[in-house]
Amino acid sequence: MSIFPKISLRLEVENYLKAGFMNEEQFNGLSFPILQHPDLQDVLLIPVIGPRNNIKQQPCEVIVGAQCGNAVLRGAHVYVPGIVSASKFMKGGDVVSVYSDIKGKCKKGAKEFDGTKIFLGNGISELSRKEIFSRLPELKGVGVRMTDPVYLSPSFDNVLPSYLFLQNLPSAVVSHVLDPQPGEKILDLCAAPGGKTTHIAALMHDQGEVIALDKISNKVEKIKQNALLLGLNSIRAFCFDGTKALKLDMVKDTDGEPPFLPESFDRILLDAPCSGLGQRPNMACTWTLKEVTSYQPLQRKLFTVAAELLKPGGVLVYSTCTVTLAENEEQVAWALKTLPHLQLQRQDPQVGGEGMLGAGLSSEQLKRLQRFDPCVVPSQDSDTGSLRDARIEDTMWLANKDCIGFFIAKFVKCKST
């Protein structure tokens, strides 16, 4: 979770969070420790508590889709569009057990479901079954308010939206590795939904220019909304395909709009489209081999464009939220061979582990990479007692490791192309 817009923890922000999320009465006797990351001064950590295995399952059931289930595991309530099925006699105010249909087999509107499902916890239904499946377009709000989830993570819905932005820890690390400076011109080549874009602008103290590209128009609008909400004026977002961002005819610049002339940017973030195998939680593993292997060529196209758009002496950071060798270390090896004007650099801060063997990189090169791999963390339950009693060093070690799968590489362009 990053703090905006200044790179310091405002006392009133920290106190507000502690008052809310350490309120044991509100959270049924539980409290959430709030920790400042020792290496990232603008990041607060709030651990997830669970799994909580003593929750009594109820006869009245609500079935949700896998994506909705993922959101519930991260602290969200159940919104009406995510509800697939509900028990026949469910009324507003009933205590219900919520399950995720991880295989997508439950039919919309079913009155019962005996297929594969994962228990997410209990909540209070806000609406009756009849109201939920009435197909009224205005029914988009909360359908079940989660009161006793298996994984307890506080909801940040409308919590200081002009000060905070929720991120996974590695996503916050990326912008620090890029190290944008006030007055620079920065490109976020694949920017949606804008968490890293806004973080970059905040790190620059909103001084300079941050260009954000994405080829899907509604995602670009989301970037603009986030920038407006956080009071950041240095961001310009465009609906544009990053693979076509390089202007080839060498005519005069187009008033700062894409495509761009070569060597236009001081720093570039390429948070590339990827297979997303590092995302957590994820209860819907629907990828085919064809899909998983389709990203490498696209990433290389974007890599080539980014290298051309970078000024000599400029910094390029490549990142993904996946764990495959092909999309990470192999891409670094390919870039060093194909784009010899790029040099692999050490990273600061170094929060994750080093790179993985198998792509032909030297041990020194692997040490210059950051790989976040939750597989290295032993499975364990967490509760407020264990978190309260743990040493701060152990808690931080766990926070740095027990996160999403992620990869970061940093390059400097040593000469003009």
Residue ranges and their predicted role:
Residues Y99, L187-L189, L213, F238, ...:
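The conserved SAM/SAH-binding core of class I Rossmann-like methyltransferase domains
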Residues P182, D206, G231-S234, S264, ...:
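Short loop/turn motifs at secondary-structure junctions
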Residues Q207-I211:
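Short beta-strand element of Class I
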